Amino acid sequence: MKNIAIIMGGYSSEYKISLISGNVVYQYLDKTKYNGFRIHIFKEKWVYVDANDAEFPIDRNDFSVTVNGEKITFDCVFNAIHGTPGEDGLMQAYFELIGLPQSSCDYYQSALTFNKRDLLSVLKPYGIKTAISYYLNKGDEINTAEIVKKVGLPCFVKPNKAGSSFGISKVKSEAELPIAIEVAYKEDNEIIIESFLDGTEVSVGVINYKGEIKVLPITEIVSDNDFFDYEAKYEGKSQEITPARISDELTQKVGETAKRAYEVLKMKGFSRSEFIIVDNEPYMLEMNTIPGLTTESLIPQQAKAAGISLEDLFTNAIELSLA
C-alpha cells in the first residue's frame, strides 16, 4: 500500500473549491492500492487532517508527519491546490527539491501556464490564436482611450494570475474601465485586458492517460451570466454540454489545438484549456493545470463521457507520477 498525500487548500481565493476537489480525490482513491492522507496547505499551517478532523503538523524538511509517535512519509503527492502555491510552480519546485513525486506538471510549466500573458505569448508562434490584449502592471498609468483603441468594446479585464474567474469583469463602456481594473488588482498586481470574442465557449481536457496524450470529450459552456464567471462555474448559472454541439471537423480542430499546446509545453498531468470559437477558429483564453476535480467540475464530466471513472482517473495520475 502506497501512502498518498492529497494536498488541498492554498493561499488564494480558490481555497474553498480546492478543499472540495481534494476531498473528492480522497473519497474516490482506490483504497485497495493507496492510503490517502488529506493535507491542508494554508499560509498559517501545513497539517495532516485525520478522519476525526484532528490536525498534525507537516515537517517541511521532508514533507513527513508524525502521528502518535510514528513518522509517516509519502510515496507520492496528489496536487489538488487551485491557485497559489499549488498551481503556480511553488509546490512543484519544493517537491522536486526534496525528491517527492507529484501528480501535476513540473514547476516551470506550472508557473508559465499560471501567467496568462506569458502562456499566450509562448503559444502564439505555434499558430495558436488569441484575443487582442493589453497589459497593465500595478502603478502603470491607465490610459482608457488607448486601451479602448487597442482592444475595443466590450472587453474583458482579468487578473493575469488568478483562477475560478475571480476578479474578472466584462466592460461595456470606457467609463467602466477604472473600476474593473481596481477589481482585478485586488487579485493580482498584473492585469490583462482582452478584446471580446463573440463565439462559442468550449473547454478541452487533455491528460496523459496510460502513457498516451488523450483529448477528452469537449464541453460547450452556455453561461446564464455575461460570461463563465464564478457563479456560472460553481453555482449552477451555466449549462455545460458534453460533448459540445459543434461539428466533428471543428471538434477535431479544437482538440488538436489543445493537444498541440500540451505537447509544445511538455506538459504532464491534467490540463484544461478554454477556447472561444469564432468563425470556425479556436482562440485560446487560458490553460489550467490543476483544474477543478469536484464531481460537478469539467474534467470529471469529460472523463465520464470518455468512459473513465474518477477512481481510474486518479489512479492513472498517481501511477504516471510514480513511473
Curated annotation (Swiss-Prot):
Which enzyme type, at the first EC level?
ligase
PROSITE patterns given for it?
ATP_GRASP, DALA_DALA_LIGASE_1
Q: What disulfide bonds does the UniProt entry report for this chain? A: none
Q: Where is the ATP-grasp domain?
A: 120-319
The catalytic activity of this protein is classed by the Enzyme Commission as: 6.3.2.4
State the pathway, as annotated in the record: Cell wall biogenesis; peptidoglycan biosynthesis
Q: Where does ATP bind?
A: 148-203
Tell me a GO cellular component: cytoplasm
Major site of localization recorded for this protein: cytoplasm
Keywords, alphabetical: ATP-binding, Cell shape, Cell wall biogenesis/degradation, Cytoplasm, Ligase, Magnesium, Manganese, Metal-binding, Nucleotide-binding, Peptidoglycan synthesis
Q: Which Pfam families match?
A: Dala_Dala_lig_C, Dala_Dala_lig_N
Q: Which reaction does it catalyse?
A: 2 D-alanine + ATP = D-alanyl-D-alanine + ADP + phosphate + H(+)
Binding positions for Mg(2+) 2 per the UniProt entry: E286, N288
Q: List locations, semicolon-separated.
A: Cytoplasm
Cofactors (names): Mg(2+); Mn(2+)
Q: How is the cofactor bound?
A: Binds 2 magnesium or manganese ions per subunit.
Please give the Gene Ontology molecular function terms for this protein: ATP binding; D-alanine-D-alanine ligase activity; metal ion binding
Annotated InterPro entries: ATP-grasp, ATP_grasp_subdomain_1, D-Ala_lig_Van_CS, D_ala_D_ala, Dala_Dala_lig_C, Dala_Dala_lig_N, PreATP-grasp_dom_sf
Task: Please list the residues that bind Mg(2+) 1.
Answer: E274, E286
HAMAP family in UniProt: Dala_Dala_lig
Function comment: Cell wall formation.
What PANTHER family does the annotation carry? D-ALANINE--D-ALANINE LIGASE, D-ALANINE--D-ALANINE LIGASE B
**What is this protein's record name?**
D-alanine--D-alanine ligase
Which source organism does the UniProt entry give? Flavobacterium johnsoniae (strain ATCC 17061 / DSM 2064 / JCM 8514 / BCRC 14874 / CCUG 350202 / NBRC 14942 / NCIMB 11054 / UW101) (Cytophaga johnsonae)
